[in-house]
Amino acid sequence: KARSKVSFGGKYDNQGIIKKTTTLRYEKARILGFKEHAEYTLQKRMAGSTANVNKFLERLYEVYYPAAKKELEEVRDLARKDGVEDLQAWDSAYYSEKLKKQKFDFDQEELRPYFKVENVIDGIYKVAELLYGIKFTEIKDVPVYHEEVRVFEVTEKNGDFLSLFYIDLHPRETKNGGAWMTYFRPQGLCDGKVERPLISIVGNLTPSTEEKPSLLTFDEVETIFHEFGHALHGMLSSVTYSSLASPDVYWDFVELPSQIMENWLGEKETLQLFAKHYETQEDIPDELIEKIKASQAFNKG
């Protein structure tokens, strides 16, 4: 609520800029022969047309609305127990999280001991090897921009070179927040020759301390799996022109490889590849895996 007050008033109010932007977009689309900006934009999207987008949204509504309505009522019931009769948007996240803890008795901190960052990275590589037959070998003789950066050579099963893969996972004062995939060289033509890519993922994961190694939350593990999906898309690209390589593809496709990779994290077989207690080396218990899966399905309507 406080954030909204700052955004919608005073020197930070950008409503006028947004209105001008949407007007100019509409005018541009009309000049180019389209009915509206959406129709113009969708010429370079898989959806292809506003009619297809609307059909897709209608199908989603039919499937999700009953579940969403039921889930929202559960959140409202919990809020009423605290005397909140009219649940507002700014209260929704708080009561949703409270309900999640009540239903699943699930605390992210329970999982940290099983997600040592080195084990997570090894697990990601195992998944990639099982699914795509590719191998990751750490190399030390490549220049890097910071001592924390690790570099891996990615090869096909037959030894053919696919990519160099740089990982830079922990926060520094000079680093932007968040996590992302990028490349130092895309796959495609470079100086007249089709080159393999130089791919990187960058993050700001929980760092190690004097007492403990880097132990991640489940959300952080999910983030790295997601970004690695983008990285895989880049590593496995095989095109002549880099404008067609990952991530320079249709924007309503670009998140698919990352979502697929992220999805594997919810599978028991995946977690058993790498989720081991950093002190005892015991596998993550089935009970915790079931809690993870149940919590992932929570409030998905």
Task: Name each model-derived stretch.
Residues 19, 23-24, 28-204, 254, ...:
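Active-site-proximal, well-structured secondary-structure segments within enzyme catalytic domains
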Residues 8, 108, 208, 238-241:
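General secondary-structure edge motif
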Residues 10, 14, 113, 117, ...:
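Alpha-helix N-cap/helix-initiation motif
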Residues 26-33, 128, 207, 212-235, ...:
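Active-site recognition of the HExxH zinc-binding catalytic motif
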Residues 5-8, 12, 20:
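Substrate/cofactor-recognition hotspot
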Residues 227, 231-264:
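Zinc-dependent metallopeptidase catalytic helix centered on the HExxH motif
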Residues 3, 205-207:
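Short, histidine-centered active-site or binding-site loop motifs used for metal coordination
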